[in-house]
Amino acid sequence: MPTLTKAELAEMLFEQVGLNKRESKDMVEAFFDVIREALEQGDSVKLSGFGNFQLRDKPQRPGRNPKTGEIIPITARRVVTFHASQKLKALVEERVEPMPASAA
């Protein structure tokens, strides 16, 4: 399955919007910088029709070293989660091609 990169997003802006390549790259970088800065400040980011980036605090918990079996603490941390909007989920579900039946 192919992956869309920031460079490819900039190229698409160049082709579809008519910005020059430098402006396209700068716009993509600025977009992600704004999202990154909002999350760093503890804000959620809601993109209508796309989804929400939210912060979630995970408490400290016990973990286990798989080699020694020793119990070690996993420190508390903050993680970023993404929840796709219903609209995005519906669009993705529409495009799913059924798996071919196995020849058994």
From Swiss-Prot:
Protein name in UniProt: Integration host factor subunit alpha
Domain of life: Bacteria
General function of this protein: This protein is one of the two subunits of integration host factor, a specific DNA-binding protein that functions in genetic recombination as well as in transcriptional and translational control.
Keywords, comma-separated and alphabetical: DNA recombination, DNA-binding, Transcription, Transcription regulation, Translation regulation
Biological source species: Ralstonia nicotianae (strain ATCC BAA-1114 / GMI1000) (Ralstonia solanacearum)
Gene3D superfamilies on file: IHF-like DNA-binding proteins
Gene name linked to the record: ihfA
SMART domains in UniProt: BHL
Subunit annotation: Heterodimer of an alpha and a beta chain.
